[in-house]
Regions:
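Single conserved hydrophobic/aromatic residue that forms the stacking wall/gate
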Residues: 161-173
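Mid-domain alpha/beta scaffold segments of enzyme catalytic cores
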Residues: 1-164
Length: 173
């Protein structure tokens, strides 16, 4: 069986002690690819380093995670834009989306950030990796205008508990 890990933050400090062993166990279990989504500007270097060490096995994605969206989001987006412009090694825009589980303070900003990154996905012809926690209706409102575009990707952490209309799933099919 061939397995693909579509979402792994193994480059984070808490995994550094046994990172090589984790990679070997993943290979032994049949994992053929590991996709690594960025979180914010503080994790780009570690993510790229991990992907460099395991080139052809670990693949970098770039984006601003919704829980990292705050008053400083424009500066973070500038960094993502620069990475996209000057590096061709990114295989997707991620991890992007909305997360209202912990905090709703930056709800509007999360919508703005998601929309901007979806536009980049289309501009650079990259798939998206969407983090959706207690926010499907809001994400739907952002994605709905893109329904007839070549936008593609996957959902991660998809929680449908707060979905208002099941028919809204048509935006993702």
């Amino acid at each position: 069986m061939r397995l693909i890990d579509t979402h792994s933050h193994l480059f984070l400090e808490e995994f550094s002690e046994d990172f090589p062993q984790v990679i070997e166990r993943a290979r032994a279990a049949g994992v053929t690819h590991i996709f690594m989504p960025n979180i914010d500007s503080t994790t780009i270097e570690a993510m790229l380093s991990a992907c460099s060490v395991y080139k052809g096995y670990c693949f970098p994605m770039i984006g601003l995670h919704p829980t990292s969206v705050n008053a400083n989001y424009e500066k973070e987006l500038e960094i993502v834009a620069r990475e996209l412009k000057f590096s061709k090694e990114y295989v997707a825009i991620g991890e992007i989306g909305m997360d209202l589980y912990w905090d709703k303070t930056y709800l509007k900003e999360q919508q703005i950030v998601l929309d901007k990154q979806v536009n980049w996905a289309l501009e650079y012809d990259l798939p998206i990796v969407i983090h959706c926690r207690d926010a499907f209706d809001y994400i739907y409102k952002v994605l709905e205008p893109y329904k007839k575009t070549p936008l593609r990707g996957i959902f991660h952490s998809l929680s449908l508990i707060h979905i208002s209309e099941p028919t809204r799933l048509d935006v993702i099919s």
